[in-house]
Regions:
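Extended, low-polarity segments enriched in aliphatic/aromatic residues
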Residues: 1-181
């Protein structure tokens, strides 16, 4: 998976293209009961939103989710590329939303979620997208990658989770309907 980080958006579009060739019309279900704001996927802050999304248009479900989170779907490269490749709909004007929310409400909604880096992803960004990119093949396509995997494991499981993460989980368990059941 480390090979894909520098081209993650293009990789996701390629995977969608393959999925549509193999099995078009697959129903996607996105669980928005508890969403995550902040650097992810392991260090997000849980936010209860109590929504479920379903669609046979994989791009549309991502576009609606992105908009609700507070992002312009067409600014998310994989959504834009998939829309331009006609693999699905990324423009909200081309998507009909029905259920507890309609398209107009989705367009008005902005949960103001944020993205960002934690210590582990900030180091990765230096190699995948930043000034150390010329060295990325040496570090991520050789056995040296195991040192990064171990460092991420130590950071997330032995530093971040005990000092920050467990408190977030306890709060979610104590204060939400999802934690009490």
């Amino acid at each position: 998976r480390h090979y894909c980080h520098p081209n993650i958006h293009e990789t996701l579009v390629d995977l969608l293209r393959i999925q549509l060739e193999i099995q078009a019309g697959t129903l996607a279900v996105a669980d928005g009961t508890t969403c995550g704001s902040g650097p992810g996927p392991r260090t997000m802050t849980p936010v209860v939103k109590n929504l479920l999304f379903a669609s046979t248009d994989q791009v549309a479900i991502d576009a609606v989710s992105a908009k609700l989170l507070g992002f312009d779907p067409m600014d998310v490269k994989c959504i834009r590329l998939a829309d331009e490749s006609e693999l699905g709909h990324g423009h909200l004007d081309d998507i009909e939303v029905v259920g507890d929310m309609d398209t107009a409400e989705v367009k008005r909604t902005d949960w103001e979620f944020v993205v960002g880096d934690n210590a582990a992803s900030a180091v990765g960004d230096l190699f995948w997208f930043g000034p150390l990119k010329p060295l990325s093949k040496i570090f991520f396509q050789t056995p040296i990658v195991n040192a990064f995997i171990m460092a991420s494991f130590i950071y997330h499981d032995y530093i971040w989770y005990p000092t920050e993460g467990w408190g977030r989980v306890e709060k979610w368990l104590d204060e939400t309907q999802w934690g009490r059941h």
